[in-house]
């Protein structure tokens, strides 16, 4: 579960840094706030941040950004400007793309691909012109996350439209059969 993931991650002595977490929805925010102690609600740049401690004095800053890649990017920039975290984790609910990952397990991205982008044949499907095909995860964080029970490292396909049918999921998996999870 996400609780076990963040508790275990925060206890890891190899990673003694300030971690920022961005989430899209209120339900995701409430789950994470339940893990913090000494929580302080702060406002910066018109945004609300929650700063607190989890396990052994590890400081976390959490923000609910709203749904979509643009909101996540804006939230990450606001968090960087206000708190200067060493790392930012985007956390949230995603659809399972394979039966290899049981329900309620965590997928830690090795890389993220866009499932809703096509910039013609000069680029790979999902690649924005001038950008990489895939966005790689931080190797040190991935190494730590991979040691946690019920965490599965793999590709996450992310986009800005809700994948609400098996047909849509199938189209995404036609392009990215290695994906373990589909975001939105």
Q: Which residue stretches match the model-derived regions?
A:
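N-terminal short beta-loop-beta anion/metal-coordinating cradle
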Residues: 17-77, 83
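Short, Lys/Arg-enriched N-terminal segments with co-localized hydrophobic residues
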Residues: 3-16
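Proline-aspartate-enriched helix->loop->beta-strand connector
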Residues: 84-89
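Mid-sequence, gly/pro-rich, charge-dense loop/helix-turn segments that line enzyme active sites
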Residues: 97-177
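Short pre-catalytic strand/loop immediately N-terminal to key active-site residues, enriched for Gly-Thr
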Residues: 61, 176-182
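Alpha-helix C-terminal capping segments
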Residues: 78-82, 98-101
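Generic structural signal for well-ordered, non-membrane alpha-helical segments
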Residues: 21-25, 29, 69-72, 134-142, ...
């Amino acid at each position: 579960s996400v609780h076990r993931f963040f508790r275990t991650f925060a206890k890891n002595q190899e990673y003694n840094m300030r971690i920022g977490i961005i989430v899209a929805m209120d339900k995701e925010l409430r789950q994470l706030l339940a893990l913090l102690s000494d929580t302080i609600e702060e406002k910066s740049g018109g945004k609300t941040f929650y700063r607190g401690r989890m396990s052994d004095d590890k400081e976390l800053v959490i923000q609910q950004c709203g749904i979509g890649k643009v909101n996540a990017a804006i939230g990450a920039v606001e968090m960087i400007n206000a708190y200067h975290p060493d790392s930012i984790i985007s956390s949230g609910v995603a659809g399972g793309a394979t039966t290899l990952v049981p329900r309620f397990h965590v997928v830690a991205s090795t890389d993220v691909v866009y499932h809703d982008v096509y910039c013609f044949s000069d680029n790979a499907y999902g690649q924005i012109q001038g950008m990489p095909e895939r966005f790689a995860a931080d190797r040190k964080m991935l190494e730590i996350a991979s040691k946690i029970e019920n965490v599965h490292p793999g590709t996450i396909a992310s986009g800005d439209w809700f994948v609400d049918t098996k047909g849509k999921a199938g189209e995404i998996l036609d392009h990215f059969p290695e994906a373990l999870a589909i975001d939105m």
